Amino acid sequence: MIKFNGLDRIYDAYSWRITHRAKQVWKTGNVVGNRHVEGSYVDQFETSVAKYTKRKYAVAVGSGTDALYFALRAKGIGPESTVACPAISYLATAEAIKRTGATIHFVDVDNKGLISKLPGFGLPDAVVYVNLFGNLADYSILKEFCIKRRIPLIEDAAQSFGSFYNLEQRRC
């Protein structure tokens, strides 16, 4: 039988690290800390992610759905808004948009499941760009389109975290 994916190989390679870290967290009980205790594992995680992605900040949230929701709300997306997102994605993408009260415009994708252009339905208030199956596309055209029109472009990197594009400094 040919497996759809070989996650067992990845687990075998990293399981000792995962188990070791989990034991440390369970032993200390200091997962999120509190306002009087600094240096929790969440703080360490946020610092590491910010450094890895070359961003000033990173904020850990409960799920990727929450991350998308908070990003949309931070850009002012709400009940009167329209948001474009790929027609092929995980349910969380549409769910996060729907939670804001915005109208979703599903956009066709290319053969890798990535948005390559926006259709002529009018300008959306935001675009959620989803990297599927670990693929990163050259989204420079979409980015340029959004920048020129001051449309927020939110990248959903849940399936591509840690990926590089053309070995450049752009990390998800």
How would you label these PLM feature ranges?
Residues Q24-V25, N30, S116, Q169-C172:
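Short, intrinsically disordered, charge-balanced linker/junction segments flanking boundaries
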Residues R73-F164:
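PLP-dependent aminotransferase-like
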